Amino acid sequence: FIRNFTHKIVQSGLFVLFFAELWERFCYYGMRALLAVYVAEQFTQGDRSAASGMYGAFTALVYALGFFGGTIADKYLGYRRAIIVGGVLMAAGEFMLMIPTEEMFLMGLAVLIVGNGLFKPNISTLVGKLYKQGDARRDGGFTIFYMGINLGAFLAPIACRWVAGVMGTGGKPDYRWGFIAAGIGMLLGVVTFWRGFAALGDKGLPPKGREGMSSILVVLFGGLALAPAVYMLLAKAELAGYVTLALLIGILLYLIGYGLKSDKVTFQRILALIILLIGNIAFWASFEQAGNSLNFFARDQVKWESTDNFPLGGTRGELKAADAQSVTLPVGFARALDGAKASAVNITVTYPSPENVNIKVDATAELAS
């Protein structure tokens, strides 16, 4: 069964897209895990508000440019070439983040944003192109594809932060090496995708009349020409907010206009898409706190001490509160304790000294029936 299942994945090209997207998400989430904290420490003299503004502008522009990347692939490049060009630009942007000047850092982010706009929407579309409408394997294919996304996003913060810690000096991480690790991951994704062209068959080829290299060069240089405009928006985070809002309104009007000109079924699908987009705004605004406010909270309130270089704090990792000698952790799920069913558990850890650690467990419990 496993051999037949794997054979179908490889033959369909899903294997190639799985690993290409895994490495692209490794690149993005590895960089994102370090971005806000690095900006605060390197460029804003510890000002979280300014660092958060730049982070917000970055994420807003990442999502906004995906719309244009998909349009360019449809009309000019085709999905394959858009993915390759986007991946190369993302890797180049990551490597530019290594340069410790604010100007080059912002330009690196701008190049990365343009590259992500070409890569991200088109590889997801290419997964859909692998299956005909109504194919029973379609849902399973997207499930496997999203497993690659989640795996890359899970591994990236651990690996990139570990590299930054290993390459740092004086107990302080050098986040620039984390960006390098993310860029190398992106290059691995590009190579994986390029080497797997044969498994994709005729999927993702450029439109007729656009097969030459001229389309690639136009988009590549056009993307590089767009980077300075993105740079300006990153440098002026408040302006980026207004521009992103204008883009959102423009995209919504475009979709509505396109739907009104189309048949009834297409219009209904576009209307459903718009409703989902409204919900998505609230979700992603909350989700992106993982790379922003939650990152600062983890940095300031949690400290890992280790005797070795193991990524998660070593075999003797000691979790300490930053400004206290005790921490209470509420656990909001049922847990069996000595025959009782606990509805809430408070775990208090006190450590007057590293050699004297006390753990006290208080539980609100009911007798198990």
Language model regions located:
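Disordered extramembrane loops and terminal tails of multipass alpha-helical membrane proteins
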Residues: 1-8, 108, 124, 196-369
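A membrane-interface helix-boundary motif in multi-pass transporters
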Residues: 47, 162-184, 230-243
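Central cavity-lining transmembrane alpha-helices of secondary-active solute carriers
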Residues: 55-75, 120, 151-156, 184-187, ...
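Cytoplasmic membrane-interface "Motif A"-like loop-to-helix N-cap segments
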Residues: 75-87, 134-135, 266-267
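Intracellular juxtamembrane helix-capping segments at the cytosolic ends
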Residues: 118-133, 291
